[in-house]
Design a protein with these regions (language model features):
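Beta-strand scaffold of nucleotide-dependent catalytic cores
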Residues: 13-15, 22-44, 48-51, 77, ...
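A short, glycine/Asx- and small/polar-enriched loop/turn
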Residues: 94-100, 200-204
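Acyl/amide activation-and-transfer machinery of modular secondary-metabolite enzymes
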Residues: 49-59, 201, 205-206
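Conserved ATP-binding module of the ATP-grasp superfamily
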Residues: 1-19, 50-57, 75-80, 240
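A short, structured beta-strand-centered segment in the mid-to-C-terminal lobe
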Residues: 59-67
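Peripheral (often C-terminal) accessory segments that flank ATP-dependent C-N-forming ligase machineries
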Residues: 131-286
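Short, well-ordered beta-strand elements within core beta-sheets of diverse protein domains
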Residues: 16, 59, 119, 205-214
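Active-site "cap" helix and flanking loop/linker of ATP-utilizing ligase/carboxylase catalytic domains
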Residues: 68-90, 96, 105-168
Length: 286
């Protein structure tokens, strides 16, 4: 079995099963002082064959009554690993017996996440705070020793598919872009491959959707609708052909009827704006 980078795995790590829910504590350290930059809580679903797959990651203001315990545990992990400078991404399972470490990496979280969206929710990004730690260590604590708080709420939804097939169209781009909290997304994996895999893990998710709103209720209403579409109307997100025997054709989109792609000029511009929004792009950017 190979890694996600195509390199052979030569070892195995066994971990005990931790029953609970998973959270993330992202930090930036400077001279051994740790500053929380953002907190996340993962949601997961169970597939028909019993696999646990990521459903989404929500940016949260705190972890409720276990906040202090989890943050103290995360800081203790950083101290034990001697992470005294720069970014760290710590994943923790909150169990009935207390926090359990899943992983801690001396890195920022989510290189593919929209930094613009994160900045709108926090007023900064973990990468920006990291630069401050390296470039201005003497003034870092004075500048960042303030309570962690959100300006807006955010949730990154990892779409899931129970079907596998060649991709005919992605009506979900236009549909989801119309939701109040949807600010962007990433469909590039499906667009490049021309197919949708049956989702069994994070890497077989067909797309990511980025949601952000001042009202947390609106955020949850929109993601609830997306989950309903995944379960009851996947064809409204991805139109697929079940004939997988034809194999992958890199120019699959050229074989589709024109009426699936070409529209009158007066309709084309709004459609383009919708697609740019859904993909997190703006006019003139490739």
């Amino acid at each position: 079995m190979n890694t996600i980078f195509g390199e052979p795995n030569t070892s195995v790590i066994a971990q005990e099963f931790a029953d609970g829910y998973e959270v993330v504590v992202n930090t930036v350290s400077c001279k051994g002082w740790h500053r929380v930059t953002d907190l996340w809580r993962y949601s997961k679903t169970i597939t028909a064959d019993g696999r646990s797959v990521y459903d989404g990651a929500e940016l949260v203001p705190d972890f409720g009554e276990v906040t202090d315990e989890v943050l103290g545990y995360a800081f203790a992990v950083l101290d034990a690993l001697k992470i005294t400078i720069g970014a760290a991404h710590t994943e923790i399972m909150v169990t009935a017996d207390g926090p359990v470490l899943i992983e801690c990496g001396a890195r920022a979280m989510g290189g593919s996440f929209s930094q613009t969206l994160l900045r709108s929710c926090l007023g900064y990004t973990q990468l920006e705070v990291s630069l401050d730690a390296y470039l201005s260590p003497d003034t870092f604590r004075a500048r960042w020793d303030r309570p962690y708080a959100l300006l807006r709420y955010a949730l990154f939804k990892f779409l899931a598919s129970t079907r596998k097939g060649m991709l005919d169209a992605i009506p979900g781009v236009t549909l989801l872009a119309g939701l109040p909290s949807v600010k962007g997304g990433n469909f590039l994996g499906s667009l490049e491959s021309g197919e949708v895999e049956r989702t069994v893990d994070l890497f077989t998710s067909p797309a990511d959707i980025y949601l952000c709103h001042e009202d947390r209720r609106v955020l949850h209403e929109d993601v609830s609708l997306i989950r309903d579409l995944e379960k009851e109307a996947q064809n409204l997100l991805f139109e697929m052909s079940p004939d997988h025997a034809q194999g992958h054709n890199p120019e699959w989109y050229l074989e589709l009827p024109d009426d699936l792609w070409l529209k009158p000029e007066e309709v084309g511009k709004p459609d383009a704006d919708t697609i740019w929004k859904a993909l997190g792009l703006r006019e003139g950017v490739e």
